[in-house]
């Protein structure tokens, strides 16, 4: 589950600051990500020939997973799983995030000190799309592209 989360968000933000002006700019840069998000669509695209290997809406218990980003650069993820025909909470992750508007890198530092990054392809006040190349989905020896579309919850 962390993989899907990072795929989607690693592309978003890596906040660094060198002075007061940079800090102000960083605070403005993270505002679109602040809030609660849910995955709405996942696509896998072949790294060999750009064919779409999978394109599907997020459904079932996975559609209930929430990704919350705070203004203080904290994040929390709540996961759900199916148990006896109903979705139940199945754990959570917390930590801090940083975003670089220039590189579009979103870096997560989990509370267990694990660090992961993802690339944010696009971000506005209602949608975020992350792109990553970390796995060989179709076992052809070439890493494929994972694209995850998130919708901001109101």
Give the label of every model feature segment.
Residues 1-4, 19:
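Positively charged n-region of N-terminal signal peptides that target proteins for export
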Residues 19-94, 100-154:
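Lipid interaction determinants
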Residues 14-17:
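C-terminal motif of bacterial Sec signal peptides marking the signal peptidase cleavage site
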Residues 5-10:
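Sec-dependent signal peptide hydrophobic core
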């Amino acid at each position: 589950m962390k993989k899907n989360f990072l795929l989607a968000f690693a592309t978003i933000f890596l906040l660094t600051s060198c002075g007061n002006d940079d800090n102000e700019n960083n605070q403005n840069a993270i505002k679109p990500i602040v809030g609660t998000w849910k995955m709405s669509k996942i696509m896998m695209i072949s790294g060999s020939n750009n064919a779409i290997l999978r394109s599907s809406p997020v459904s079932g218990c996975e559609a209930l997973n929430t990704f919350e980003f705070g203004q203080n650069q904290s994040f929390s993820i709540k996961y759900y799983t199916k148990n006896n025909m109903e979705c139940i909470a199945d754990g959570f992750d917390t930590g801090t995030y940083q975003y670089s508007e220039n590189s579009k890198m979103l870096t997560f530092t989990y509370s267990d000190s694990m660090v992961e990054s993802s690339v944010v392809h696009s971000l506005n006040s209602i949608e975020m799309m992350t792109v990553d190349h970390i796995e060989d989905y179709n076992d052809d020896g070439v890493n494929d592209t994972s694209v995850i579309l998130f919708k901001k919850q109101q």
